[in-house]
Amino acid sequence: MKHLITFCMCIISFIAFGQIKNIDMKKQKPKDMKKQKPKNLTECIQMLDKNLKKQDKEYIKTLTEDEFFMESHFTLGMGIRNEWLRSGNPELVKFFLDQGVKHPDDMSAMILTSYYRHLTMVND
């Protein structure tokens, strides 16, 4: 019974607090994003800046860093992992491996965090 209640509370919380404005990489410019192969973090930021819509950038600026990360991990972050990291982009993967970042989730997290800080001019 305890597990059922916990499960129900998790589902309710997800529905109540999981109202995500999708910034979906695949909805931006699918053909362009698939063709682009950034080689390092700077190129990732430049390509995101080029491909995200102005309204999405403005929306991102209204979020805290944690909110942006939580909202984008399964949307924009998944697009980054699928299109840039897992689709055979050895230069970008090598860049992150050289930095000691081994898992695609961590790689996309670094890209997302860096992009957020680029947009909001946070220098941490």
Residue ranges and their predicted role:
Residues 1-22:
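Bacterial Sec-dependent N-terminal signal peptides
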Residues 55-124:
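Compact alpha-helical subdomains of small soluble proteins
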Residues 17-46, 50, 124:
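Sec-dependent signal peptide cleavage junction
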Residues 5, 26-29, 42, 108, ...:
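Compositionally biased amphipathic helical and low-complexity segments enriched in hydrophobic
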Residues 8, 24-27, 31, 35, ...:
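A near-ubiquitous, low-amplitude feature marking generic local secondary-structure context
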Residues 13-15, 31, 75:
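A general, composition-driven signal for non-globular sequence regions
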